[in-house]
Every structure is written in structure tokens, then in C-alpha cells.
A protein has these predicted regions:
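Active-site helical microenvironments for divalent-metal-assisted chemistry
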Residues: 1-179
């Protein structure tokens, strides 16, 4: 069993005694399989990112489907795994959540829209008919900010930081996620 997988399970078991370990392990195996040899800017295997996001979600005490969604959140966007395959293997709820996170990721915030950030935040909330989608996206952004120093392109780093400051930080505060 993968070390990060164990940390996620331990956190989850601390508040939920009915853990579907097999389903979580299967999601980890999918992340490892589908992200394959992809790497983060830091050089670590890409699948480490969704596992870190899942650990944040476990710290937030969300349900099994949310943890599995965090583990699979980048697979539709970055691999050849399909929503249909996610639904077949993990159920309709997980597929819907992964789809929601993917849709939020596709919405691009532009620096020149700083004054419209409030409208953009409202759009993100409106597009998330399930609060778990927003929480997973915020956990994703939190982990990306924790590892931003590995991005070598200063413009890309600045864009991510500005987007976080103008969009995601106020959104996190609004829904009570000050971390």
C-alpha cells in the first residue's frame, strides 16, 4: 500500500469508522496507472499531487466519494481516463464530482479581470451545484500554492499567485475555509 494512501486512510478512519479501503485503494491505483510517468515541476511523480489533495480533503473530514474525487480530479483533464470509466468503477456521484472539478478547472481567470473577480467567484459558486466540488478545487489550489516554488516560469508563477489571491482566497474565506 502506498505511504500517502496510508496517511489518507488514517486521517479518514479518525472520523469515519466505515471506510471503504478497497475503493480508495482502487482510486490510488487508477491515479498511478493513468498519470503514469507524468511528473510535477518538482520532479516527483504527478500522482503525488492528487494524493496530497485527497489528504487535505480527509483533513476537512469529507466523505469517501470526496476523497476518491480528489484522487481522480486531474484524470479527465490530463489522461485518457473517461468519465464513463470513472462512473463504472466508482459510481455516478464520483463521476459527477470529477466532472464538476474538471469544469471549474477549465474556467480561466485573466489578470485584466481583477475588478470582475467578485463576479467570477459568484460564477464558480453557481457552477458548483455540490459544495464538495468547490472544496476539492480549493484543496487542489492549496496544494498547488504549497508547491509553487518549483515552477520556473516567473510569469506563470505570478499568474497562479494572482488568481489565488484575487479569486480562490476570498472564495475559501467566504465558505469558511481559512486555511
Amino acid at each position: 500500500m502506498h505511504l500517502d494512501h496510508q496517511k489518507i486512510l488514517e486521517k479518514y478512519k479518525s472520523y469515519n469508522i466505515t471506510v471503504d479501503e478497497a475503493k480508495i485503494k482502487k482510486a490510488v491505483e487508477f491515479a498511478i496507472k493513468y498519470h503514469g510517468i507524468q511528473q510535477r515541476a518538482s520532479g516527483v511523480p504527478y500522482y503525488s499531487h492528487p494524493l496530497e489533495v485527497a489528504e487535505i480533503i480527509a483533513e476537512m473530514r469529507l466523505d469517501t466519494d470526496s476523497i476518491i474525487t480528489a484522487i481522480l480530479h486531474d484524470t479527465i483533464e490530463d489522461t485518457d481516463l473517461t468519465l464513463e470509466e470513472i462512473e463504472e468503477n466508482f459510481g455516478k456521484d464520483v463521476a459527477k464530482l470529477v466532472d464538476g472539478v474538471t469544469k471549474l478547472t477549465k474556467i480561466k481567470f485573466h489578470e485584466d479581470n481583477v475588478r470582475q473577480a467578485e463576479n467570477f467567484r459568484k460564477l464558480l459558486i453557481a457552477l458548483s451545484d455540490d459544495i464538495r466540488v468547490l472544496l476539492i478545487k480549493l484543496a487542489d489550489r492549496l496544494h498547488n500554492m504549497r508547491t509553487i516554488d518549483f515552477i520556473s516560469n516567473p510569469e506563470k508563477k505570478k499568474k497562479i499567485a494572482l488568481e489565488t489571491l484575487e479569486l480562490y482566497a476570498p472564495l475559501a474565506e467566504r465558505i469558511g475555509m481559512q486555511q
